[in-house]
């Protein structure tokens, strides 16, 4: 695992001296120096099984004093079994998947699964692989108010696949539908082959560009029974000057914009789609009208869909009341 460090460098000589480095079995970062020569510092320390806490450390004497005493409030989730592995798509591209299985899971038990993802664009395999130089297995699996790992308490497997969209500069999204389908298909085949998941009981979800990907997955594939899409964009013609890593204007790549827009493929939606949107979403690409229009289209087409809009929420639920309501709808 990568080991964060701090070096002291001579301005004129360029000579370096390492004054701090994380332990190999921990994830430690320097939070703050306490004096000019960095002989005393505050360090954040955590591991895969130890919740993050802050320590005051004298780097000269190695004396340590713990100054925060955070506790793991969700041991039944953080102790869940996590598997991280590589899959091979039909086109030969290799990508990574993380699967979280409920605490106490018995091998061979096929579970319903929830996919949660966010597509990202890359120029090639090497560019994708470079992003994993910073992955650290010693990070503690924190649980937030909207962490989908909470679903493991209900007996679901959580599947978090990387979904690389690959193409050269200026043509990044030309293979978007194919890359999306191929990655999801390869992921499903692998987790089914490992005996973890029931292929007939799959859901999918995501937030923002992940919501866009979710709606696309449900119109481009027959794999999923249900989807959750939050604060998404579903009609790329409403972002005509580009989006994500797409730099072509709508008028240069009109067919691509339409092909990538779930709104224009809404008649092909399989499964049930739940959408949620903050009514004060100020993100330039995800105006609430996107959810309004897609919901109306699905309603006209007789598809099973629901939409929940939350007042005073921006691009991502923040309030206690909204979070509780979302979980009530999701489960």
Predicted regions and their residues:
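Active-site donor-binding loop signature of nucleotide-sugar glycosyltransferases
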Residues: 21, 69, 89, 119, ...
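Active-site-proximal cap/loop segments of hydrolase catalytic domains
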Residues: 126, 130-331
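Flexible loop residues that form catalytic
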Residues: 46, 59, 119-120, 207, ...
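Surface-exposed, flexible loop/turn segments at secondary-structure boundaries
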Residues: 24, 49, 62, 72-75, ...
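Non-catalytic accessory segments flanking enzyme active sites
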Residues: 3-109, 146-149, 153, 190
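Short, well-ordered beta-strand core segments
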Residues: 41, 114, 227-229
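Short hydrophobic segments within beta-strands
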Residues: 100, 116-117, 205, 276
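Short beta-strand element of the alpha/beta-hydrolase
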Residues: 108-121
